[in-house]
Regions:
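Amphipathic, non-transmembrane alpha-helical scaffold segments
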Residues: 35, 89, 93, 115, ...
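Helix-turn-helix
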Residues: 41, 49-83, 87
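Hydrophobic alpha-helical connector segments
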Residues: 87, 101-131, 182-189, 219-223
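Generic hydrophobic, amphipathic alpha-helix propensity
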Residues: 38-47, 63, 88-92, 96, ...
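C-terminal peripheral helix-coil segments that are non-catalytic and often amphipathic
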Residues: 1-26, 121-124, 157-173, 188-236
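Short, charged helix-capping/linker segments at alpha-helix termini
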Residues: 31, 56-57, 176, 180
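Short secondary-structure transition hinges
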Residues: 123-165, 183-186, 212-215
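Short coil/turn segments at alpha/beta junctions that flank glycine-rich nucleotide-binding fingerprints
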Residues: 52-56, 107, 129, 173
């Protein structure tokens, strides 16, 4: 018997994880709707500002002038430029689809075909909305170590890509190894997919950061090779 997607998404561990993530933060609960709207407007503008200028070149003064909002107000909401970037990063990655958001006919083909589906759509997705992908790329490679640690804690706590449920689907279908701790498999999946997708994207967003140009035929070959290597590592 195979587990359904809904069964996997309703798993107690996932519910517990979401409960932890969604626990209100002291001092930040019950914001006035006007204050919440202002905060959201700042984050949205910050996403574009960071995407266009990078993290280090971005200036809170410029963002303040653009929004006609006092610089002190921005710091009151987010504490620092780093705090604002982390919130922009969270909003960016929360906007991405999860693995199990793939079409039902793709999910029926199994774990590695779901991966293939998303890898083939990577460049199309970034062309449709480049700002969150650029912000995510900056969070992965263009920020200080202290911010990177905070980003890693967020990714571990929230699992925005639905990696844990996706790995359980692969194990339940008999496609992913069950003799290895699933948490380790999730980590391997996240690490390798992040780096490989970034390599596919950066020629479009940051030419020269990775050595391979965006060539559709070469990318198709590299996707096939990547899936072959990943299947050899975690596949049955």
């Amino acid at each position: 018997m195979t587990a359904s997607v809904n069964d996997l998404r309703s798993h107690p561990q996932i519910k517990q994880r979401r409960a932890i993530v969604e626990t209100p933060v002291p001092g930040k609960t019950h914001r006035h709707p006007r204050m919440e709207a202002k905060r959201e407007r700042i984050v949205n503008a910050a996403m574009q500002h960071f995407a266009e200028h990078g993290y280090h070149a971005a200036r809170i003064e410029d963002l303040s002038a653009q929004l006609d909002v006092a610089k002190g107000s921005i710091f009151q909401y987010f504490g620092s430029k780093g705090g604002l970037f982390v919130e922009a990063y969270k909003k960016a990655v929360r906007s991405f689809p999860t693995y199990l958001d793939s079409p039902s006919q793709i999910r029926e083909r199994g774990f590695f075909e779901i991966l293939r589906y998303w890898l083939l759509r990577t460049e199309r997705l970034v062309r449709e909305d480049w700002i969150p992908y650029r912000v995510a790329l900056l969070g992965n490679y263009g920020v200080d170590l202290s911010l990177k640690r905070e980003i890693n804690r967020f990714l571990l706590a929230e699992d925005p890509y639905g990696s844990a449920a996706f790995v359980r689907l692969g194990i339940a279908r008999g496609e992913v190894r069950s003799d290895i701790d699933s948490t380790l498999i999730v980590s391997i999946l996240d690490w390798t997919m992040e780096r490989f997708q970034d390599a596919l994207l950066t020629e479009e967003l940051d030419p020269g950061l990775f050595p391979h140009p965006a060539d559709p035929q070469k990318n198709q070959m590299r996707i096939n090779q990547f899936l072959l290597v990943l299947k050899g590592a975690i596949g049955v």
